[in-house]
């Protein structure tokens, strides 16, 4: 819709900062562990019972927008429905930071998460830009032979062509409920 397109454009032109949607106090009724990696927030959310599965969550937002209440709801549902731990990394965003800084922080956080939660089975989850970032993380893990490697990866509408120049992008937009050409 037109209003949605205007909101998306506003987020890219003047991205909101410190919206607080994924602070520890927002997760009512959950167990949380919050810390930071070089000034960037990381929070692990779990329930009373966990099954050993641990999702490392990379949010979408075009690499400029912070996580939203929708991301928080996804995290809460993964914890409630599947007994998973979910760790969210509030990674550096553009235009203030470069992709190099984002990769550096995400990889430091990944190492800390896997050390703090030794023995968990790790999964990587990314939506939209977070899906593209998840693929970059997998490449770094592979190239640098970092373990543990995620057991599974879930990419929800991953943004993998930042130029938006793929001639078949229109076909993909028809099948992808999150992808819009606006």
What are these regions (language model features)?
Residues 33-182:
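Alpha/beta-hydrolase superfamily serine-hydrolase fold, recognizing
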Residues 1-49:
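A glycine/proline-hinged amphipathic helix-loop "lid/cap" segment
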């Amino acid at each position: 819709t037109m209003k949605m397109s205007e909101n998306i454009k506003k987020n890219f032109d003047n991205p909101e900062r410190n919206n607080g949607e994924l602070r520890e106090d927002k997760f009512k009724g959950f167990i949380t562990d919050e810390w930071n990696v070089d000034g960037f927030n990381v929070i692990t959310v779990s329930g009373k019972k966990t099954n050993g599965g641990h999702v490392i969550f990379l949010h979408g937002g075009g690499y400029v927008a912070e996580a939203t209440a929708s991301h928080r709801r996804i995290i809460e549902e993964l914890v409630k429905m599947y007994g998973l731990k979910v760790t969210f990394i509030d990674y550096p965003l553009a235009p203030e930071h470069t992709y190099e800084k984002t990769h550096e922080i995400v990889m430091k956080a990944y190492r800390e998460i896997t050390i703090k939660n030794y023995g968990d089975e790790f999964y990587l989850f990314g939506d939209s830009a977070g899906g593209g970032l998840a693929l970059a993380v997998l490449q770094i893990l592979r190239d640098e032979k970092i373990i543990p490697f995620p057991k599974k990866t879930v990419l929800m509408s991953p943004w993998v062509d930042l130029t938006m120049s793929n001639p078949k992008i229109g076909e993909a937009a028809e099948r992808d409920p999150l992808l819009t050409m606006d």
